[in-house]
Design a protein with these regions (language model features):
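A short beta-strand motif characteristic of beta-propeller blades
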Residues: 7-13, 55-61, 94-100, 137-144, ...
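Long, acidic/polar, low-complexity amphipathic helices and coiled-coil-like
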Residues: 1-67
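Eukaryotic tandem repeat interaction scaffolds
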Residues: 74-152
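C-terminal closing repeat unit and adjoining cap/tail of repeat-based domains
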Residues: 135, 164-197, 201-205
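Short loop/turn segments that connect beta-strands within beta-propeller blades
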Residues: 3-7, 51-54, 90-94, 134-137, ...
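Repeated scaffold domains used in trafficking and secretory/extracellular systems
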Residues: 16-26, 62-75, 101-113, 145-158, ...
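Short beta-strand elements that form the blades of beta-propeller/WD-repeat-like
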Residues: 28-41, 71-82, 112-125, 152-164, ...
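Structural motif
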Residues: 39-49, 84-90, 125-132, 167-171, ...
Length: 213
């Protein structure tokens, strides 16, 4: 662990777990580790939350599934995701919550003010999917279906975008479709800014499609 001046603060290690991912809280006061192990032939994951003043974990959460990715979502919580499971974990160590996803996770994204979007669907059918919107308190606020392939997702404080081939679908947080925009080529990524502008990125360029109305 290093500070902003690139000075080593401390080193943490484990002989029993593989470190799958790390995350830093938005306020810069804590870090989280996703640790992966096995017990009886099944995956066991732990999420540790540490402060910068000590290498001793302050909080620990245990999950009987694979957790391979952590992403901070505002000041209150982080997303902890695996192949077919997802949780929110409070940065203050007070709780974790199972998001009860159905199927494999397609994509997810967080927004700095605390909103998150997560998409999942059937492993053998990429045309049947669902989208979960998680609020600033780390609890789901809506869940709606999306009947087309999902190549990416983005979110801001008011809207969520879903990238599907060359189309960017814009929804509000309740799952109401607001608009559909088309890119000249299939983008690799799409983001929605705080003001509602939608930017797509492919191998050679960035494109501003439109401002969300």
């Amino acid at each position: 662990v290093y500070n902003k001046n690139n000075d080593l603060i401390y080193t943490w290690n484990s002989a029993n777990y593989y470190v799958a991912d790390v995350a830093v809280s938005n306020d810069g006061n804590a870090i989280a580790l996703a640790l992966l192990g096995a017990s009886g032939g099944t995956f066991v994951s732990e999420v540790y939350i540490l402060r910068f003043d000590s290498a001793t974990p302050k909080y620990k959460f245990t999950f009987d599934t694979l957790i391979s990715s952590l992403m901070s979502a505002g000041e209150n919580y982080m997303l902890a995701t695996g192949i077919d499971s997802a949780y929110t974990v409070a940065w203050d160590g007070s709780s974790s919550s199972n998001l009860n996803v159905s199927g494999v996770i397609r994509s997810f994204m967080t927004y700095e003010s605390g909103w998150s979007a997560l998409t999942c669907g059937r492993e053998n059918n990429d045309q049947i999917n669902s989208v979960k919107i998680i609020g600033q308190n780390g609890m789901p606020i809506s869940d709606f279906e999306f009947f087309s392939q999902i190549d990416g997702v983005g979110i801001n404080a008011a809207e969520v975008i879903i990238l599907s081939d060359q189309t960017v679908c814009v929804y509000d947080h309740s799952g109401n479709l607001k608009s559909e925009l088309t890119s000249d080529v299939k983008p690799l990524h799409a983001v929605i800014t705080q003001s509602g502008d939608i930017i797509t990125v492919d191998n050679s360029r960035m494109q501003l499609l439109s401002a969300a109305e």
